[in-house]
Amino acid sequence: MVLRFGTSEAGGTFHSQALELVHLFNEARPGGEPCIVTNNLITLEDVTLFDRGELDFGLMASNWIGRAKDGAPPFTHPIALRMVAPANAGPVFFVARSDSAIRNVSDLVGKRIALGPKGSGMAQHAEVIFKSLGISFDSFTPVYLGFTEAATALIDREIDALWQRPIPNQAMTELSERADVRVVSYAAGQLAKIVSSVPFYREIIIEKDAFRGATAEAAQVGVVNVIVTHERAAQDIVHAMAAVIASNLDALPRLNPLFKSLKALFAGLRAHGPAAFEFGGVPLHPGARRAYQELGWLE
């Protein structure tokens, strides 16, 4: 039997994190069922694979798992996802060419904006953010492209801005090396409005020099991404994955900087109990709960 860990497109945020987790997981279980990383252009489609029993673990944005559990749009029926652990808290943000007149999000009106693959979690994040700011999708031209394709389109001036996932990621790094770009900021009060009206968002800082073109700190929308499984997943398998994560909170950021917020997220587990990890009301899997109790993160 082979275990499968579902992620996004190759080279993306989720894919790069899963590669490190799966390596540690397999290393900790010599002789156990091997786990492999799979990739899908649209991670929300992984929920269907969970429902069909074709995935054992997966990475998703925390806001979508509650919808999957409840069968709310874009999902057509309840899907029994269970939480394993958070993966990162990272910024989602718009990027424009440095010679563009686009300075803040309001300047995107009337422009061509790449939002990620159609139907993807990133595209739906963009919808939520524009709606919270009262910006209609009719006021600009949405373009649905993968992140690598969008980067090329920005360089070729086929689009005016693109929507970017948490960094570091390969597509953003390569874009910043190929072209002069900048982060699109929020006008006064816009970021506070988004964070106050959408409970699964938070403010997060893109650090200066995070990539070429990030010339100053930039406050952006942050989202927690999480590792999930299905309620039918065997307790010992989920226990093993959760134990690997909780035992490597210092090592994981050295393997991939996307994990740098992980230890702080685990501090919430110790302070507030399982609810700190149960985003969208999705329960912690019993195997994960047992691992965290054994390692002292839960009573």
PLM feature spans:
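Extracytoplasmic
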Residues: P30, I42, R52, P78-I79, ...
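Short beta-strand-centered segments that line the small-molecule binding cleft or hinge
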Residues: G66-D70, I79-N88
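Ligand-binding clefts/hinges and TM-proximal coupling segments of bilobed small-molecule sensing domains
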Residues: L115-V128, F200-A267
